[in-house]
């Protein structure tokens, strides 16, 4: 943790996250933090850490035999998360100290971090409900628990606290939006002098843009890369002058270098609207490799186009400097522009020619399905089962 915090500080980042370390999974960490632990695991009578790993990996031993929680894909990534279970008897409350311990650990190093935690709405939407109660039945308890967490962070000296709400990029019902508003009206009422960042990613918030900008968040993080309508939403609806826009413009999911020209064009457009902008990654960098320093066997003609996690931090720092100057004559900008102007491996002329030659009839598959089905049945003669 010390290494990562120090790296980010030395790179020049203004907002350094904490509570992003996990023994196994951040969703599981959040569930445990709020006492969402199924009874079959607590009945084992194990230590807190062993109970955590029993939920993550299962347990077979003297205390009993239980399977791990189910696993699902984390939205549209190849990362998987543990699906927390909640039953009707679960008492949701702030039960853990790990996020506060890490904040204090970083503060002792002279680094005031921005604690990051999965938000109340996303947590409720990802839970597996095994009783009669549903998400709305837990709204008051969850809101109170998160409000308590926020108050504790502010008391500890946190300037910003980030709540990750990727579920907001899904298609939302009016009931979903009402639940989100109920949760955060309670949470934000307790923020005091602290500042709260609502962070979204993996898409745009077209179903709730007006709702989230109307709430008392101090910052809102939007994905300008996977969010197809993000730019349009900001242009059409504006952005509150009393909030900070954390613009996700450095891709947190792929390995490619950032096109500075395209990124700075968006930043310039936002600044022209007098929007207070902070340059951000589109999502967490856990989805990309760690650093290019370890890629000693790849030719430079490939690596010069790559940016892994460490390199993306450097891109953030470099783009921050460029955004505040007349960058079009800056050496870093010109080098980046030159790189993108001479990327021979990204264009295959033969493929371009084939695409250009596509005709309307090429989209019709022949023979028709019934004929293909008859041919396949005759050819393979597969049994019914």
Where are these regions (language model features)?
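Domain-level signal for soluble alpha/beta catalytic cores
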Residues: 1-385
């Amino acid at each position: 943790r010390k290494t990562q915090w120090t790296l980010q500080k030395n790179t020049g980042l203004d907002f350094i996250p904490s509570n992003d370390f996990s023994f196994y999974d951040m969703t599981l960490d959040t569930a445990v933090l709020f006492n969402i632990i199924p009874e079959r695991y607590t009945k084992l009578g194990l230590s807190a850490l062993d109970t955590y790993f029993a939920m993550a990996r299962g347990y077979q031993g003297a205390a009993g035999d239980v399977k791990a929680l189910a696993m699902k894909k984390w939205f549209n990534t190849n990362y998987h998360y543990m699906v927390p279970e909640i039953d009707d008897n679960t008492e949701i409350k702030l039960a853990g100290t790990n996020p506060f311990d890490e904040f204090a650990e970083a503060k002792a190093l002279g680094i005031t971090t921005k604690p990051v935690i999965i938000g109340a709405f996303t947590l409720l939407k990802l839970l597996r409900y095994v009783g009669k109660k549903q998400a709305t039945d837990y709204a008051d308890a969850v809101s109170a628990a998160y409000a308590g967490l926020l108050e504790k962070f502010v008391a500890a000296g946190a300037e910003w606290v980030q709540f990750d709400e990727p579920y907001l990029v899904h298609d939302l019902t009016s009931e979903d939006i009402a639940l989100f508003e109920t949760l955060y009206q309670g949470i934000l009422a307790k923020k005091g002098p602290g500042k709260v960042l609502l962070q979204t990613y993996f898409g745009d918030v077209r179903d709730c843009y007006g709702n989230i900008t109307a709430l008392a968040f101090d910052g809102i993080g939007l994905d300008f890369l996977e969010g197809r309508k993000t730019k349009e939403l900001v242009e059409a609806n504006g952005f509150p002058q009393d909030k900070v826009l954390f613009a996700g413009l450095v891709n947190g999911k792929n390995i490619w270098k950032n096109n500075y020209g395209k990124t700075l064009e968006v930043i310039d457009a936002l600044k022209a609207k007098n929007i207070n902008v902070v340059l951000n990654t589109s999502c967490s960098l856990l989805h990309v490799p760690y650093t290019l320093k370890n890629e000693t066997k790849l030719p430079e003609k490939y690596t010069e186009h790559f940016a892994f996690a460490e390199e993306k931090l450097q891109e953030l720092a470099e783009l921050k400097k460029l955004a505040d100057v007349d960058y079009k004559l800056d050496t870093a900008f010109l080098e980046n522009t030159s790189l993108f102007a001479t990327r021979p491996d990204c264009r295959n002329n033969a493929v371009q020619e084939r695409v250009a030659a596509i005709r309307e009839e090429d989209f019709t598959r022949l023979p028709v399905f019934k004929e293909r089905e008859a041919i396949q049945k005759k050819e393979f003669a597969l049994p019914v089962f």
